[in-house]
Amino acid sequence: MGVQKTEAEVTSSVSAEKLFKALCLDIDTLLPQVLPGAIKSSETLEGDGGVGTVKLVHLGDASPFKTMKQKVDAIDKESFTYAYSIIDGDILLGFIESINNHFAYVPNADGGCTVKSTITFNTKGDAVVPEENIKFANDQNRAIFQAVEAYLIAN
């Protein structure tokens, strides 16, 4: 299995607690409001929202993909960290075994926060994820972050 990793960091004037809640705990209800083309629906297949929960996400018309199945790997409401894996769906392109996503919301002295993200692509065999797919994943995360951040600032 091949492994490719990408990391990103962005700062926000919104607190770590507020961004963590919006982007990790309330994302299924909030995202369709702030970025309507991103997700059509999300249904819980297993679990209660905690670690081990499996969700089937039907992506919106703005996405070139239709579905993805996500599994919550870790949630820490005190340190504002969240991790989930994409374990199935056309988003895996047939040659990716899984995509692990880890987010840490680090409080800043000014009341805002720094969001650190790591995306790990686990490929089948010797497959390599093309750079444009890695860029697409980072761009999608950035677009979601910016839309939710703007919503939180406005409300």
Curated annotation (Swiss-Prot):
GO molecular function per UniProt:
abscisic acid binding; protein phosphatase inhibitor activity; signaling receptor activity
Q: Per its UniProt record, what Pfam families does this chain match?
A: Bet_v_1 (PF00407)
Q: According to the lineage, what is the superkingdom? A: Eukaryota
Question: Matching PROSITE patterns, A to Z?
Answer: PATHOGENESIS_BETVI
SMART domains to which the protein is assigned, alphabetical? Bet_v_1
On tissue specificity, the annotation reads: Expressed in roots (at protein level). Expressed in roots.
Which GO BP terms, alphabetically?
abscisic acid-activated signaling pathway; defense response
* Temperature dependence per UniProt: Melting temperature is 65.3 degrees Celsius. Unfolds at 95 degrees Celsius. Partial refolding after cooling back to 25 degrees Celsius.
- Give an example GO cellular component term for this record: cytoplasm
Q: What keywords does the record list, in alphabetical order?
A: Allergen, Pathogenesis-related protein, Plant defense
Subunit relationships: Monomer.
Q: Which family does it belong to?
A: Belongs to the BetVI family.
Official protein name in the record: Dau c 1 isoallergen Dau c 1.0401
